[in-house]
């Protein structure tokens, strides 16, 4: 056996607990891993001889320590605890280290080295820690070793440290029994960071060039002594205090205490700052400290010498043994503290202060301390400053707990309260709070009281309900329903009427029933409670009924107990069963008759079959009754046995009745499925863990909790819970309770919150909770969905497997757990006082509604079932999320596989629903399909769902229909072609216009669903055949597989081709159709071999495609898809049946696709690209487009070799391609009827004429994206011009040739002519427009009789050779052509008559336009767009306003706004008397009808009497019901003026302007903004301003000018001789009579002046101005028909208000040829209408 080598490192690791104890004694903490790392990897790199296995050599340890404690960036502060611990182990070795440490030699006693004078050499400088320069003192010639007095050098019994020395320092150990003194040259200088251990262990060191300065303390003998900082103290200060940036106050206080207690030197201050501050923080502190240096005058100084003397950055030469040196050090510390305080001031952030709030259980005193600390930390304010007490007090009140803050705000004389008073009051409130135990007791007591009250109320209601039920049941004698009143009356039996003195008991007279002697006396026995008394068929009272037979049935998903009542003619429901019909019937009972309604017809599944039945709805019936109607349909048999009555069917089986809702009626069409797993089935008992009914909630045991990753920028979202009805809350409460009990929901506190949405289940009163997780889904990372596609999922099911098992996992998502870190994402609010829940709940399992839940569960279940698939390779297992399909070839294999699957699911923790299970059957339903015998069918339920949808009325309903029907498109041949008319209506912004085409397509899709065939399941072991056909741009096909000699369809495919492919010839369209359907068929064939059969030779086309039709990209795509010989093969050309898309038995006529394509490649068959030998002309065309002076110029030219035939400038911005097309088209036009060779150097124009033009035309000139191609009009013009020449050859030549051939000369001349035309000739857009529009050439002109008559009047001549009329040397354009041209031009420009006329005059048209000006005016006037937008030029003459005949009878009112609104007055209510012009104005704060009524009744009526007429605009204050009601009660005729017509209220509107102008001038003159104060002056000015008749309103009203007082005339004696009051009134009456009468006559004369009426008449069409137009909205609306008129206004059809004539303009309508003639008859009330023109 070998021996292990023990090293210092391994020794420490073996005794690690002792190492940790030693480190703890040094106040540090060490970790084993870092201990090994530093010892073996870090310290050996220091270059001091440290071995990788460690050492206990003290010299090496001290050298490593000096490296660790190095100042600046070269130090290692993180290694301080570890080297200090190594040092402690070496100095005081524990027992397990002593054998490895050499014994220490006892040092010889030597005398300590006394301080010596400083060196004359300059001290060495350091960037961060400059050396201290010792003071220069005379060096003694001979050092004194012994003292003069002969005393001992050091008191060995003293515990004081040795005296402070300049060069050396003697150290003593802790016991004081030894002393050491060595020279400074023997040991290197220690690091700046020192510790108390050095006083015991470090050998003394001294530098001949520096002096050491240490923290000073005064010893017992009066000498300064050095006490260095401990490394553990520095380490603890660093780690146990926040950083300076985080909390500068706390660190400043710490440094201040250290400076006060330790009195550090300059070096130790640097050491302290370097340890506690970062580099940036230290620089900031030093800078602030230097700013605080003050000069001789006591103010901060910036003199460098004074700043450096007081606060040096390098080590100063201060002598700390002198008072002056110590004073320097004290000043340095003070400045350092000032720098710390100034650097620690953070910017003001009151938001942080406001964020400090009192905690629920925090005392006010503690809260106040936190608040003050926030003030100190985030603001420059001192919270202890008396000036800041108010701010602190307000923050304390507002940010206290709500209950404390509210009570503090209500304190009396709050301003006089000090902060201490507020704290004491808050403490008193805080101490009076309820304790948690008291609060819990109070809540418990209130809950118990509430529960007691609820229980008492329920008991009372139950008792009342029992009494009412017994009372009604005892009174009910029969339930008879009759549709006829006479039957009801005939069947009644009335109680015999009693006389007044007749006994009701014995029927004798003379006494009443209570005094009857025959009535038995004694205690009353218990009254028998009969629940129902029945009648026989004749209505007589039967004997006492037997025990009541009851049957529990399912109605609308809810169990309902029916009472079998053979006396009830009809069955009765007591609760609302859904919609009721309009039919009703009388129900006669003991208490009388009452009418009740019937329910709508319901499909009821009885034991005898399906029937339609309607129940009678009787809410006050005590029980639902099963009457004779349903008993008859049931063929029920009632047996009376000893145990009671039993109701059974005709075969003796128990009866069950199911009532369905209307939306579930489609299920009645389904065939009867195999019975589900019954509770007594062996499947349940054999596999109890696999079923949700017996195994409880599932839990996937092999799946780890899921962690939901968030997006990088996601932040928590909190959405409040929506209001929830009480019914909905009670509906979801049981579900929440169940989930809480199962642990799926747990209480939580989360920053996330999303609302809970209760969704009512159809046909029931039950609710289910649904959480709205849309906002959470936005913030969660997306994962790639791996859920299988239902479209091709069944492709993996071979037809040979015909035994199926279908399982539906219940609550599947709840089987997966959520990680606790992800659970808060799905929190929601829930409050239930009964359960003691008020807060948030969250999910511990994967929730529903989360976007990634299906993918996560599908992947987890796939992983768990992987072993099952491996162990059962003969079985087919398909999984779609939580729906599982198991298929086998035989029944035995299916049963064994099902058992194994159930066992596996149970062991894995998944639970299946027994109610939905379909076990070992040959026919099952899976994913909406019916699987049977290797085929899949559309279920009848799916068909009925589509058939039951009503005709769509909106795009959304149409999308729903197409989505539902699109699910079934595999069963519908040509579905895309059928639905083509419907898809355009689903686009956004399209008008939903449902026409005959849409209705036809809608019905065809429904009809196709009814005849949907069965499709075979894809068999991946057999090849597939794809039959493809194409028709009008729609690809149709059927995917088949051979089944014996027949072809069985697998899927019907259809799709619309893109616009480019739809424009190809039929053979190429077939290629595109095959490519499209091949891609869709690949989803079902899963890459298996495919044979394509089509009525075209597609393979040859794909191998040699015509490059003129296909682009390179399409060609490559088709070849890669269709020439894959391993997967795609082409069969022989076959003819297909259009109905079935299968081949016809007879052979079709073959055709050559390549030959057909060659024939259809161009537009003109004789068009060639070779020169014609006998051509009449050989021309050269060219188009040029270039930039000149920042503008793109363009031109086109047609030339020969030597001369220019045609050259024209084109509009700026024309492209070169367009110019080439225009030039080529012009050449073809000029060569009409001739043989032409035309050369062009444009590949674009050449290819368009020869190849692409026909392609563009076939596909409707659209691109592949469905947009119009560029240069559409030029391409169409070129295609039409190609047929004009007799023979034509378009030849391509190279551009810019330099040879001397005829081709080169002609091309150069054409290019030069095009450039010169573009530069010299201005573009003529009008001529260009006419020339480019081929229909407007003379060859197309057709003249009418009216045109010919006009031409003869003008004296025009007819050109026989050219076939058109000529006038003034120009061809004459007919009137109809002129109208079409000008109408097109106006629709392009929408210019007015004058602008269009000037444009045509300047353009010098080559044609004479017949009736141009008249047609132009008509086109401009009849344009609807211009009429809606253009302003009206019509001017309406001024009208006449009606005035009053005396003052105060007729007023005009209006509100005007005056800003700024002082004292809340923003409005001015102005009254103007129309007779005198007198004005009354009242400042108001609101513009309301209440203000108007108040001023009218309180101001106008008492002073001027009741007005007769009031006039105003249509403001809400005047049109409101309040104002109008007041006017009606007072008999005032309130006239509302036309809307948006200020002139109608001109007098008051002008007064508003006058008052505002006057107030503006007065405010400027007075220098105040108080317009309310200046309003009387403005009114005085308005009332005393002369009007149109030279009189002021004051003079008209009072008959004299206002009295004026001359304040400068002291003699007031003239005023004393005033006449009597009576005489003054008589004079006033005379003056008023003389003034008012002439004034009223003047007003009356104005009314008699004729007013020019507006030109509108009844029946005219007018446009009405839109007064409030939005952006890009026309300013006129209409046109409207005029119904009534006045001289200034009119009323139109469709607008209730009168409209001023200035707000309308005439609408020009195109003339309509009259088709009816109106004739008068003799009867004035009759007219005769006759068809046809008069």
UniProtKB/Swiss-Prot annotation:
Residues covered by the RNase H type-1 domain: 1173-1319
Domain Integrase catalytic: 1443-1601
Name recorded for this polypeptide: Gag-Pol polyprotein
Residues at the site labelled Cleavage: 129-130, 214-215, 477-478, 533-534, 658-659, 1329-1330
One function term, GO molecular function aspect: RNA binding
Region of interest (Disordered), residue spans: 107-217, 434-498, 512-552
PROSITE patterns: ASP_PROT_RETROV, ASP_PROTEASE, INTEGRASE, RNASE_H_1, RT_POL, ZF_CCHC
InterPro entries referenced in this protein's UniProt entry, alphabetically: Aspartic_peptidase_AS, DNA/RNA_pol_sf, G_retro_matrix, G_retro_matrix_sf, Gag-pol_Znf-H3C2, Gag_p12, Gag_P30, Integrase_cat-core
Binding-site list for Mg(2+) 3: 1454, 1513
Region (Interaction with host PIAS4): 344-392
Motif annotated as PPXY motif, chain positions: 161-164
Compositional bias per record (Basic and acidic residues), positions renumbered to this chain: 434-465, 485-498
Residues annotated as domain Peptidase A2: 560-630
Family according to the record: Belongs to the retroviral Pol polyprotein family.
Pfam families listed in its UniProt record: Gag_MA (PF01140), Gag_p12 (PF01141), Gag_p30 (PF02093), MLVIN_C (PF18697), RNase_H (PF00075), RT_RNaseH_2 (PF17919), rve (PF00665), RVP (PF00077)
Region Interaction with host UBE2I, annotated ranges: 429-434
Catalysed reactions, as listed in the record: DNA(n) + a 2'-deoxyribonucleoside 5'-triphosphate = DNA(n+1) + diphosphate; Endonucleolytic cleavage to 5'-phosphomonoester
